[in-house]
Amino acid sequence: KEETGSDGNTGLCSSYLKYFMEDLADCFGAKGRHVLHASQCLSADVNAAFDPTFPDVMERNNCAYLNHGVCVTKFTGARGKSGTSDASAEFVGTVRQLLDKEQVVWQTGELGKVDGGGGGTVAAYIANLDVDTIDVGVPVLCMHAPFEVVAKIDVYMTYRAFFVFMAS
């Protein structure tokens, strides 16, 4: 539902995840809010890769590139500071250290220049539950076009990033 909005009782903005976590925690004698606060989330979402055909929509020094590994996106949003989700420096450090330790090739990237489009992800909705959350995913060339392009090494490194995160 992300591409059409995450609202309504079937979207991530609904209360179902919070209620589910509270019920699950209750089964083990814990409080849902404590479980959520102690949780960490890698929000699986793609990032825009630099497109040499349209270089003006990206900031070359702050964007993802194909064949440079999984993309870790500290913040998302559009229109300057609107609708953003911003991972804490501490959680970014935790993720970076884990990826480095496990030799996962990674890069950082933004979703485009300020006021040049950009976009949001569902990370903000998870982060609003008091869960440390960061976007991690594959850089994509021609995102949302009929023919999208990704690099095989980036897909593999994304798999590895999630694998080592879940194993830690």
Feature roles, as predicted:
Residues 1-65, 71, 117:
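Acidic/histidine-rich catalytic neighborhood of metal-dependent amide-processing enzymes
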Residues 3-11, 81, 85, 112, ...:
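Hydrophobic alpha-helical scaffolding
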Residues 8-19, 86-94, 117-120, 153-160:
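Conserved active-site and cofactor/substrate-binding residues in soluble primary-metabolism enzymes
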Residues 21-28, 50-51, 99, 103, ...:
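Structural signal for hydrophobic packing residues in well-ordered secondary-structure cores
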Residues 23-29, 71-77, 138-140, 164-168:
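Short C-terminal domain-edge/linker segments immediately following a structured domain
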Residues 138-168:
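His/Asp/Glu-rich mid-to-C-terminal helical/loop segments that flank catalytic regions of hydrolases
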